[in-house]
C-alpha cells in the first residue's frame, strides 16, 4: 500500500490503529456542509407543542372491558358449569345419588385470529342453549302460553338432538331427564315402567290420554310448553323399540322427538317428583300409584314391619312348602317379596346367604324329627295324600301278574317288608335286562320319598349315611362286588338289629336299617357264595320284557297316582293302622308350628 502524505507508518502491534483520517474530496464542498442538518439525534427529546387528549379514554375503556370480560368468564366457570346447583332443583340436587360428569367445555376464548378461532366460536354458539339455564322465564303449564316460547327450529339446527331435547326438558320441568330415569343402552331390554318425553305433540295431546289407557295400568301425563312428559306402567313388559313405535304412531311425531328411559325405582327424590306432580292441577293421572312410588312416599303399617326380618317366619314357610335345598329356599322366598313384608326385609338384609343356609339346616332338622316320630302307616298316609290326581291300582297288579308272580305271595312279602320284620325287611327284584325292575322300584321309592344308594360311593365310609334319613331305601343294580360287601358287612343290618352307622361331621348313629329294596341281574339264591344272605333277602323274578304301546308309552302305568290308589285299596290287607285310631280319641292333630308368632296373635 502507498504511503500517505503527512503520515508515518508504524510497525509492530500498533499497525491496526489509524492515526490520521483520510481526506475526502466530498467534504470539501462548503455548500453541502452548511446545508446539512446540524441537530443531534436527541434534539427532539422535548416536545414543546400544545397537549392533545387523543384516544386515551377509548384505550382505557377497552382495558376496562377486557378486565370485566375476564372476571365474567371466571364467574361463568364457577357458577354456570354443569355442576352448578343453580341448574338443578335445590332439593333434588341435595339428595341426588347419580354421578355428575365433568365439564369439558372451554369457557375462555383463545386470543388468536384465524380459522380455528372462528370454528371454536361456532361450536360454542351451537351449545349455548345447553350451557346457560333459564332462571326466571318459565312458561305456564298446558300448552305453553307463558312469556317464553320454545324455538321449534332449535331441534333442527342442533347437531346433538338428544342434548337439545334434554335442555328443553330441563327448562320446562326444572329437573334433568337423567335425574328421573336410569339408562338402558340396549333397545331390546324389556321393562313395565317407562318415562317418555315427547316434543311438540299439542295436536294429539288430549287424545293420547284416552288411547294409552288400553295399554297401561297407570298413566301420568303433564305438558309444559312444547314438552309432554309421560310416566307409563304397561300391562306387559315392552322394550324401547316397541315403546317408540307405539308413541310415534299415537302422537304422530318422529322418533327424534322422543326421549325414553325406565324410571328410577329406588330413588326417593324421583318418586317424590311423580307423587307431588300427580297432585298438580296440570297433571292427568289414570290408575293407582305403582308399588315403587307408594312404598317410598306413602307411609303405613307395612313400613315398620318391613324394617325387621323374622327368621322363624322364613323357616315356617320352607317347612310348609317342603323346601330342603338352599337354592329352592332362596329362589322361592325371593319371589314372595312383592307381597310378603318379611321377604322384603330379607332381601334388604346383608346376610341373605347366611339366613338361607341356616333355614335349610333347620328345615332338615325338623323334617328328620317329624319322620322319626311317624310310624310307617303315618308316613305312607302322609305321602299319598300329597299326590294330586287319581290313578288305578290295577295297573300295578297287572304288571306283577304279567311277570308271572303270584300277587297274594307278593302282597304278603310287601306287608312284611313295610313293617320291617326281621330277616324280611330286604326285598330283591332280579331278572334279565329291560324287564322293568328299576322302573317298578323307582316308582315305589318316588311316591314314598325314599333314598337311593349307589355302590359307586362305596369307597367312602359315609355311603350308607342316607339310611338314617329315610323310611325306605333302594340299592339299584346290585353286582357281585356289592353282594360281597353286603355278605361281609351288612348281615346285622339285614337281620333287623341295631347297627352303628358312621355319618359325616357327626358321631356314629345307632339305628335299624329301614326297608331296603334291591334290583339285580343276579339270582342271589342260586349263588352258593352268598348262602348266608339267602335267608335274609326275599327275591322275585321279572323274566318278561317291559311291554310298550305302539306310541312308545308304557303298557302299565306305574305312576304316583297308581301307587296312591294301590295303598288306599289294599290298606287293610297290608295291615296298615287306621289313622283315626292313632289320634287321641279321634281328635284332630294340630299342624306343626316352628315360627315365633303366638297362636292367639291377631292376623
From Swiss-Prot:
Q: What Gene Ontology biological process does one annotation of this record name?
A: DNA replication
Does the keyword DNA-binding feature in the UniProt annotation?
A: yes
Which residues take part in binding ATP? Answer: 431-438
Q: Which reaction does it catalyse?
A: Couples ATP hydrolysis with the unwinding of duplex DNA by translocating in the 3'-5' direction; ATP + H2O = ADP + phosphate + H(+)
Gene3D superfamilies noted in UniProt: 3.40.1310.10, P-loop containing nucleotide triphosphate hydrolases, Zinc finger, large T-antigen D1 domain
Enzyme Commission numbers on file: 5.6.2.4
Record-level Gene Ontology MF annotations: ATP binding; ATP hydrolysis activity; DNA binding; DNA helicase activity
Region annotated Disordered sits at 578-603
Q: Where is this motif: Nuclear export signal?
A: 88-97
Q: Where does the record place the region DNA-binding region?
A: 144-306
Q: SUPFAM superfamilies, per this entry?
A: Origin of replication-binding domain, RBD-like, P-loop containing nucleoside triphosphate hydrolases
- Which top-level group of life is the source organism from? Viruses
Q: Domain named SF3 helicase: which ranges?
A: 405-555
Q: Where is the sequence biased in composition, kind Polar residues?
A: 590-603
Give the record's PTM text.
Phosphorylated. Sumoylated.
In UniProt terms, what function does this protein have? ATP-dependent DNA 3'-5' helicase required for initiation of viral DNA replication. It forms a complex with the viral E2 protein. The E1-E2 complex binds to the replication origin which contains binding sites for both proteins. During the initial step, a dimer of E1 interacts with a dimer of protein E2 leading to a complex that binds the viral origin of replication with high specificity. Then, a second dimer of E1 displaces the E2 dimer in an ATP-dependent manner to form the E1 tetramer.
> Quaternary state and partners of this protein?
Can form hexamers. Interacts with E2 protein; this interaction increases E1 DNA binding specificity. Interacts with host DNA polymerase subunit POLA2. Interacts with host single stranded DNA-binding protein RPA1. Interacts with host TOP1; this interaction stimulates the enzymatic activity of TOP1.
Q: Record's HAMAP family? A: PPV_E1 (MF_04000)
Could you identify this protein by its name?
Replication protein E1
Q: What is the lineage of its organism?
A: Viruses, Monodnaviria, Shotokuvirae, Cossaviricota, Papovaviricetes
